[in-house]
Amino acid sequence: MVASSTPPNPGPVTAGDRTVTGGRTLMLVLATVGFALNFWAWALLSPLAPRFRDELGLNSFQESLVVAVPVIVGSLGRIPIGALADRYGGRLMFPVVSLITVLPVLFLGLVGHSALAALLIGGFFLGIGGTVFAVGVPFVSAWFPPEKQGLAIGVYGMGMGGTAISALTTVRLVDAGNTATPFLLCAVALLIYASVAWYLLRDAPGRTPPTESVTARLNQTVRLPATWAASALYAVSFGGFVAFSVYLPSYLRTAYDLSQTDAANRMAGFVLLAVVMRPVGGWLADRFDAPTVLAATLCAVVIAASVQATTPDLAPIGTLAFLVLAAALGAGSGATFALVALIAPAGKVGAVTGFVGAAGGLGGFVP
């Protein structure tokens, strides 16, 4: 008697299965929106830095400091916030971080833009918005099975496009209204999001909060080989993205004598491609394996950067090199956190994410 080769019927999809899937999708959407809105707030000062320089008579160092303070605070702040996310869950931390971020946004919009000291104080607390990244990675990864975590975290990572919202709208909103306009709109959006998140967000079923103190878990996390390996990878991939998004317009104007508008448009295209490629990198890590994807993306970065180091003609070689860099850095960022979700110990995904996210943010300052 020949055994049938037909695989067993897994049975019909139940209402419970659909409910779980729908719940995962809703949680992913809410987390991504929260990430984008907080990153919008985090990036509000950068587009206005030249205006502050002219209005307040700032020198180049002071102008750079206004931009750098929220970036540094947001990067380093991911370390404790990630540990707190492990302890209290995204259901609490997303609305809390969003509500806290509203305060410096309102301060800067209403009174904090009239003096350098006020800008630096407001920028310091505005950095809290940049810590939200460390909340979402453990939250999202807990909702999805291992074979889908890479894609899910990659989709969540598209929330970094919130910086593009700021870049594209802040100056226009100031010109259409006044300095307070973009800050007030962002504050309203964060308040609405915090309210919606409080009522709709739910931590994944079966989540078990760690019992150790935050300090103890941070000490344990810093000793994990996975923390340092993923931090180095993210410092290159996301740090490279940050560096290019900051310095690319100046480089294009200097090396190729482009107009400010043309350089800004090319930078926007670079950022957009990197953002789109982030979930692709996560999906590829699910499909194959994260180390293989990371090795391929890093090789692509080395080749494209080596080509661009010779300052070739912008059309077509230079443009192609920048496109490869954007795609590889975006995919590498997505694959890195697919790796984190797999190798970080249960209960420490947020803490590891905090360290890795800090390394990525600070990696952008290397140039």
Question: What residue spans do the PLM features occupy?
Answer:
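Juxtamembrane intracellular "pre-TM" segments in multi-pass secondary transporters
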Residues: G11-T21, A204-S231
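Extracytoplasmic gate region of multi-pass secondary transporters
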Residues: L45-A49, A226-V276
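A late C-terminal transmembrane helix in Major Facilitator Superfamily
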Residues: A346-P367
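Conserved MFS/SLC helix-loop-helix module at the cytosolic interface between two early adjacent transmembrane helices
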Residues: L76-S114
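C-terminal transmembrane helical hairpin of 12-TM major facilitator-type secondary transporters
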Residues: F288-T336
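Helix-loop-helix hairpin linking two adjacent transmembrane segments in secondary transporters
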Residues: V155-L201
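Cytoplasmic helix-loop-helix junction between adjacent transmembrane helices
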Residues: G122-G159
